[in-house]
């Protein structure tokens, strides 16, 4: 069968890489793909972007399954477009994707359905937002309402930071947020301001087929740019799986208090949820959980280590998800740890520089031995060179018997790779070593 992966980041490279391993799959198309998918003979890049273009092409080519990686096509209604043409696709509809595309919708939904989350208020007026911050004090969290490539959240440790974030989001839109439409039909800037919750974060990702839910392996992302969780927030600088902080008790609590009430709540609101659902959880020191955010897709970079550990045929899993038969699938996992470190461009996250030539990359399927893979994200083939084309450039991911050994293997692979201004963290997985 032929499969289409929509997207061009590290998550999509990992999806295509895993799907291409299935004996049932003859070809994986990636739209638009990146420099890494271009190098792999099992994968074919397509220069298609619009939902209408993608669905027309998939119908003509008799694509057996389409899976969507990034948030933007989901928010644009790519799943609705495919289903209207009777094409099999795994992902949430445009209405369901509001859980991610609108922070205001998401917080109101959680409040309505009793899903544990931080106390919050929603503002369109800067004066009222500034007054609320002064009343609540710092630390406090300011979130842009709209898609912002994972960078529209400021964890303000001081009042000055919080006030600046409100001005950036409401007045100047410094984060380039795609604004949502309000009840009056007008698109405008909104912010969600919420209490700061301390604890340990975990990425809890499940597959949903409309009625059945299957949890993926647990993982933990590292949002800050620099070692020791310093510097600005990013789309994610590395991840590892499994996450020791998600104990069996926390796992059961997350399913019971967050995931299942979300699926049931969406259904009671007239929206059937299908696709991946990612709950960003904060596990407090006293063992409670709070939902920081929902994403309607796999996390990036969490996907890379999770899929390195998955032993089950991913094509079987996603087809069962698209056909409402997830109850027939049991996921098998490699018992080893997988850890991925992101190599980012000079100037990332605010102003990444493009065009730098990347040296020392493995060719073909991007693997290094049988225990490491260099997944591409912001890369492009220009002539015979692979160049930096985005903020997060590569994710070097390895399997090993322990976090420490996985860190060492990743560091070894990174030594062979280079581009001007390359920045990365050397402490991914540090919480598991405490």
PLM regions and their residue ranges:
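ATP-binding N-terminal substructure of ATP-dependent carboxylate-amine bond-forming enzymes
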Residues: 1-94
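Short acidic-hydrophobic, aromatic-tinged amphipathic segments that line or gate anion-handling sites
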Residues: 44-50, 121-125, 156
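Generic C-terminus detector
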Residues: 50, 379-383, 387-434
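A conserved helix-loop-beta module that forms one wall/lid of the active-site cleft
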Residues: 90-152
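Short, conserved charged micro-motifs
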Residues: 129, 161-164, 350-352, 401-408
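Internal nucleotide-binding/catalytic subdomain
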Residues: 156-303
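Active-site "cap" helix and flanking loop/linker of ATP-utilizing ligase/carboxylase catalytic domains
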Residues: 255-277, 295-363, 367-369, 382
